[in-house]
A protein has these predicted regions:
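Alpha-helix capping/helix-boundary segments
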Residues: 12-13, 43, 75, 99-100, ...
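Short, well-structured N-terminal submotif of metal-dependent ribonuclease cores
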Residues: 1-39, 48-64
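Acidic, PIN/NYN-like endoribonuclease modules and their adjacent C-terminal/linker elements
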Residues: 1-5, 101, 105-130
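A general structural signal for well-ordered alpha-helical segments in protein cores
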Residues: 24, 44, 56-59, 76-79, ...
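Acidic catalytic patch
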Residues: 45, 67-88
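Donor nucleotide-sugar recognition loop
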Residues: 90-93
């Protein structure tokens, strides 16, 4: 059974912010379809670390309107197991992506991302397709 809640990766927010035509972005389309979405504390960090002071309000307002899922003990255990598996297969992905994937897996949520090349290496992760 597919979850109605979708977890959004950093790439979804960056794409929305960079594009002039907001309607062409997945974030806009999901909101327009009234899809429920969340994100992770890792994604929030990645977005906010690159934001200017002028952009901070926009991002804080947006993140305040959705559930931000934390990286906790359970997600740490999941991330460690995935890391070991990917390392043994010589298919390591970036640590932030690994942490984001572990949180989505923990909460049994599909992950919406524009970075499928990295995330598809994590077999346990369900990727969202529109």
């Amino acid at each position: 059974m597919e979850s109605r809640l979708i977890c959004l990766d950093t790439s979804i927010f960056v794409d929305y912010f960079r594009k002039k035509n907001k309607e062409s972005t997945l974030l806009f389309q999901l909101a327009d379809q009234r899809k429920a979405f969340s994100t992770t504390s890792i994604t929030k960090f990645e977005v906010l670390r690159g934001a200017t002071n002028a952009q901070q309000f926009f991002w804080e307002t947006l993140f305040g309107r959705m559930e931000v899922l934390p990286f906790d003990d359970e997600s740490a255990n999941i991330a460690a197991a995935i890391f070991q598996k990917l390392k043994s297969q010589n298919k390591l992905i970036g640590i932030p992506d690994l942490l984001i994937a572990s949180i989505a897996i923990q909460h049994k949520l599909p992950l919406a991302t524009l970075n499928t090349r990295e995330f598809q290496k994590v077999n346990e992760l369900q990727l969202y397709s529109n």
